[in-house]
Amino acid sequence: MGISQSQIKDLIGDKENIVIFEVGCADGRDSKTFLNTFGDNLKLYTFDPEPVNARLVTTLGSEDAFGGSNDQLITDERHKFTHCALCDYTGTIVFNRSRTVDGPGNGYEWGRYSGSIRRPVTYTESPKYGKRWPQSVFEETVEVDCTTIDDFCKKNNIDHIDFLWMDTQGAEREVLTGAKKMLKNISFIYTEYYDEEMYENCAGLSEIKEILSEFELTNDWRYGDADGGDALFKKIVP
């Protein structure tokens, strides 16, 4: 991702209460950086559908991929994790798990970062790039809970999101569509995107810009190994 938590803090500025959504928090490394960058006025909501990630961010004694303790994610009252996928409806959805061939934990300890509610397409083999990540495979699906940002915010009495961070592996359309009511109350949105079909029928940057018609694209960090990047959008204030 192309932006740091300290830069996000500068963007948000001084506020009495700060709400950040991290959609696709993986093993919690970025989540811990958010907690250590912001003060007591932060409320951090994180989401991830991958079962291994959910275990690692909710179990005392667990570690992230680099051996850092995850205990802060459990003990810090500013953090709330929800084991689910965010999409455009509330219920259940099929999640395509990723793993690394010959990795520990049947490969899920290393390769769990590319799973998606969408089926991988050019991720596994691209006409342009070939097999970029041959050790990464998608061989298992699991049914997981899902909800929308709108439903989650209504249930948890959240009326504003200062920063929406999305690392959703091709599910950008679904996440943003599920936030139709809340979009007017979100200050910044930071999302990855793909202009190749990395995942089946995933939204490219042009479609994301159409969905976020009331936002300005302020930054676009392009990837070197894929047709895509990370984009930062700022709410247009009349």
Question: In which residue ranges do the predicted regions lie?
Answer:
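Phosphate/nucleotide-binding beta-alpha loop and adjacent structural elements of enzyme active sites
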Residues: 1-238
